[in-house]
From Swiss-Prot:
Repeat listed as a keyword: yes
Keywords on record: Kelch repeat, Repeat
Sequence ranges assigned to domain F-box in this UniProt record: 27-76
Protein name: Putative F-box/kelch-repeat protein At1g12870
SMART domains in the cross-refs: FBOX
Length: 416
């Protein structure tokens, strides 16, 4: 036993020495290269490798932590995402204090690329909500604990934010069930970037059809109210969509119809948009929004079991919609999968032909030929991604209790 421990110590010491020698050779080799050449090399490396290089040289750290470099690195990652799309799967581990796992999936190879597990100082309690990605950064929110975190899975950095004024007010109020029904917020916060990063929280303040909006200022580390607010109550059970500097929400039903509320994140002014006239449903829980190619899209999610799913896109003029995809939901055959989740538990999940007749959320367009869909298993056991091309399913990735977001990695977080 002692001999084995000594051998392990020798092997560990040898490996450490080898790494130091490799880094030393790298430092010597790179010192003979012009700074701009070294920077170009860094731009082609993944974030994980760059984080290691930061500790090897003060000059390298200065380069890698500069806003100029991080923005160039992000643009390259965004261009790469077009040809080599990736998504982030966010899952929660069921403990008294929930751990949250971020896993990157390649949609080309249908494989996991990297993962990061966060155990926050103040644990979350179910349910938790994750925002869409903004430069590879996410906002994680727990209504029960009132905790809000901004998280960068690539660098494993996170920052806790102070509670919104709405949260403080509700905590002091100790509301009744009727009060909660009137003041129920949109659970999903919107995390966007104008000149600086912004966190936007829209909620219904009372029964008199008044809506309030709070914006978190990262520089001031404080929440503030927007004075120009929509005169419509917002449908609470939705995830806001973001495209071209605008955020979108559904209103509650008015006179048997719903509308789309839009917020310009630069001017912080709201405007009202119509929904596609050919989408028959007037119930906001029966339709959904998504972003495809940086444009707002809409589709029906409920109603009679439909074989065909239609996806509509808002035109740039914002006065009309156009149908861009018609998807046959029965293009997939019976299948089963072995699922490896973020905690090394293997499960067996089955989908039948009946399960497939459920509207799916478009995630991305892959090389202009395939549309990538996130499909919720009808028994609510999880989600899967499916890639459709000309009514032919190519691949599936089932993921238990997952939020699925597009992903680009941001190296630094100085702006927030």
């Amino acid at each position: 036993m002692v001999m084995d421990e000594e051998k392990q110590a020798i092997v560990s010491s040898s490996s450490s020495s080898q790494r130091k020698r490799r880094y030393k050779k790298l430092m010597i080799a790179s010192s003979s290269l012009p700074d701009d050449v070294v920077e170009e090399i860094f731009l082609k490396l993944p974030v994980k490798a760059l984080m290691r290089f930061k500790s090897l040289s003060k000059q390298w750290r200065s380069t890698l932590e500069s806003c100029y470099f991080s923005q160039r690195h992000l643009k390259i990652a965004e261009r790469s995402h077009v040809d080599h799309p990736k998504v982030m799967i966010i899952t929660e581990k069921w403990n008294p204090d929930i751990e949250i796992s971020f896993r990157t999936i390649s949609l080309e190879s249908v494989s996991f690329l990297s993962s990061a597990l966060f155990n926050f100082p103040r644990g979350f309690h179910h349910p938790i909500y994750a925002s869409e990605s903004c430069d590879g950064i996410f906002c994680i929110h727990s209504p029960k604990t009132q905790d809000i975190y901004v998280v960068n899975p690539a660098t494993r950095w996170f920052r806790q934010l102070p509670p919104a004024r709405f949260q403080i007010f509700m905590h002091k109020l100790n509301p009744t069930l009727d009060t909660l029904r009137d003041m129920i917020p949109v659970n999903h916060l919107a995390f966007v970037k104008a000149t600086d990063y912004k966190l936007v929280w829209l909620y219904n303040s009372d029964a008199s059809r008044v809506t309030k909006c709070e914006v978190f200022d990262f520089k001031a580390n404080a929440w503030r109210y927007l004075t120009c607010i929509p005169s419509y109550r917002i449908y609470h059970d939705q995830k806001p969509a973001s495209a071209n500097g605008t955020l979108y929400w559904f209103t509650e039903t008015y006179n048997a119809e719903i509308k789309v509320i839009a917020l310009d994140i630069h001017t912080e002014i709201f405007r009202l948009l119509p929904k596609p006239s050919l989408i028959a449903s007037s119930e906001p829980s029966h339709i959904d929004m998504c972003i495809i190619d940086n444009s707002l899209c809409m589709y029906e999610t409920e109603g009679d079991k439909k074989i065909i799913q239609e996806i509509w896109r808002l035109k740039s003029s914002e006065d009309a919609w156009e149908k861009i995809y018609t998807i046959n939901l029965l293009s997939s055959s019976y299948c089963h999968f072995h699922v490896l989740d973020g905690y090394n538990l293997t499960r067996l999940c089955y989908w039948t032909q009946k399960d497939l007749v459920e509207s799916s959320t478009p995630v991305a367009i892959y090389k202009d030929k395939k549309i990538i869909l996130s499909h919720r298993y009808t028994c609510n056991l999880g989600k899967r991604l499916e890639v459709l091309e000309l009514h032919a399913k190519l691949s599936n990735i089932p993921c238990p209790k997952a939020s699925i977001c597009k992903r680009d990695a941001l190296l630094v977080h100085r702006a927030i």
